[in-house]
């Protein structure tokens, strides 16, 4: 056995920048951001959901600090999800629910060999079905897994006030403010019948469901803090439902 391999090495918060040696004597909880690569109107980047999930996960770990009983680390994000409703727009890459579910299951099975807990931090609503099925299976197999949504009450649906405000807070240089226009602001329940058959393009030519013209960085800071606090509280309580959603 190489004794040098067991030297204590400071543990960074990012899995992607860690080394195997740094992980060797630890059994951390790993937070895995799960996002998407999909259109977000003419003003937001394709990786908006991934950025939000990664930023929330990273801030949650910073809030946790370094508790004596558990280290926490943020994994590189899963940047592709179930985004079929956005495939009418260039740039969208959807792997679908079945592929995402399989990816998450195999991810959890592998990571559980060296982690204490796995938390998927979800930034895209289209991923929920895959997350629920995958985490339920992981838990059935005896793995300590859960998932949390980056959600807030009264949020609009897509690329509107909510997401644009958050991006103005976490990635202001990547919001094309001169492209801000109001999208379809009808209730989502009213739009769903047409979206099921024709996707988002059937109800919004620009791919916006909501009104980004009202977005502000200050509002984004408030919404982001609410997302972070909500996820952190769920993780601290650790009360998964039958689908692994932390409540």
UniProtKB/Swiss-Prot annotation:
> Where is a divalent metal cation 2 bound in this sequence?
40, 49, 163
Query: Which EC numbers does the record give?
Result: 3.4.14.14
Q: Which cofactor does it need?
A: Fe(2+); Zn(2+)
Relay the cofactor remark from the entry: MftE appears to bind one Fe(2+) and one Zn(2+) ion per subunit. Fe(2+) seems to be catalytically active while Zn(2+) could play an auxiliary role.
The UniProt catalytic activity note for this protein reads: [mycofactocin precursor peptide]-C-terminal glycyl-N-{5-[(4-hydroxyphenyl)methyl]-4,4-dimethyl-2-oxopyrrolidin-3-yl}acetamide + H2O = [mycofactocin precursor peptide]-C-terminal glycine + 3-amino-5-[(4-hydroxyphenyl)methyl]-4,4-dimethyl-2-pyrrolidin-2-one
What Pfam family is a match, any one? Creatininase
Keywords attached to this Swiss-Prot or TrEMBL record, sorted alphabetically, are:
Hydrolase, Iron, Metal-binding, Protease, Zinc
**Entry GO MF terms:** hydrolase activity, acting on carbon-nitrogen (but not peptide) bonds, in linear amides; metal ion binding; peptidase activity
Tell whether Phosphoprotein is among the UniProt keywords.
no
- The keyword Transcription regulation is annotated on this UniProt entry: no
Q: Name one GO biological process term.
A: riboflavin biosynthetic process
Following inactivation of the gene, the phenotype reported is: Cells lacking this gene present delayed growth in ethanol as the sole growth substrate. Glycosylated mycofactocins are produced in this mutant, albeit in significantly lower amounts than wild type. MtfE can likely be complemented by an unknown peptidase present in the metabolic background of mycobacteria.
InterPro entries associated with the record: Creatininase-like_sf (IPR024087), Creatininase/forma_Hydrolase (IPR003785), MftE (IPR023871)
Q: Which residues bind a divalent metal cation 1?
A: 38, 49, 124
**Subunit comment:** Homooctamer.
Q: Which family does it belong to?
A: Belongs to the creatininase superfamily.
Function statement: Peptidase involved in the biosynthesis of the enzyme cofactor mycofactocin (MFT). Catalyzes cleavage of the MftC-modified MftA peptide to liberate its final two residues, which consist of a cross-linked valine-decarboxylated tyrosine dipeptide (named 3-amino-5-[(4-hydroxyphenyl)methyl]-4,4-dimethyl-2-pyrrolidin-2-one or ADHP). Is required for the in vivo ethanol assimilation in M.smegmatis.
Which named protein is this? Answer: Mycofactocin precursor peptide peptidase
Protein species of origin: Mycolicibacterium smegmatis (strain ATCC 700084 / mc(2)155)
Q: What is the lineage of its organism?
A: Bacteria, Bacillati, Actinomycetota, Actinomycetes, Mycobacteriales
């Amino acid at each position: 056995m190489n004794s040098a391999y067991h030297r204590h090495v400071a543990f960074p918060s990012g899995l992607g920048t860690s080394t195997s040696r740094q992980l060797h004597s630890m059994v951390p909880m790993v937070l895995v951001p799960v996002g998407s690569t999909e259109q977000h109107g003419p003003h937001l980047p394709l990786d908006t959901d991934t950025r939000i999930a990664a930023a929330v996960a990273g801030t949650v770990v910073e809030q946790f600090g370094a508790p004596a009983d558990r280290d926490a680390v943020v994994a590189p994000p899963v940047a592709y999800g179930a985004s079929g409703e956005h495939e009418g727009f260039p740039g969208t890459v959807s792997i679908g629910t079945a592929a995402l579910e399989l990816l998450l299951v195999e991810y959890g099975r592998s990571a559980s060999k060296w982690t204490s807990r796995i938390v998927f931090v979800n930034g895209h609503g289209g991923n929920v079905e895959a997350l629920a099925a995958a985490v339920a299976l992981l838990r059935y197999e005896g793995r300590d897994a859960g998932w949390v949504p980056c959600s807030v009450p009264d949020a609009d649906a897509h690329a509107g006030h909510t997401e644009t405000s958050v991006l103005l807070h976490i990635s202001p240089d990547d919001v094309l403010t001169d492209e801000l226009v109001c999208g379809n602001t009808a209730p989502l329940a009213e739009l769903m019948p047409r979206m099921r058959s024709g996707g988002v393009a059937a109800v919004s030519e620009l791919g916006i469901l909501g009104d980004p013209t009202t977005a502000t960085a200050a509002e984004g800071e408030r919404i982001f803090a609410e997302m972070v606090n909500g996820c952190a509280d769920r993780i601290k309580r650790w009360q998964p439902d039958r689908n692994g959603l932390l409540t």
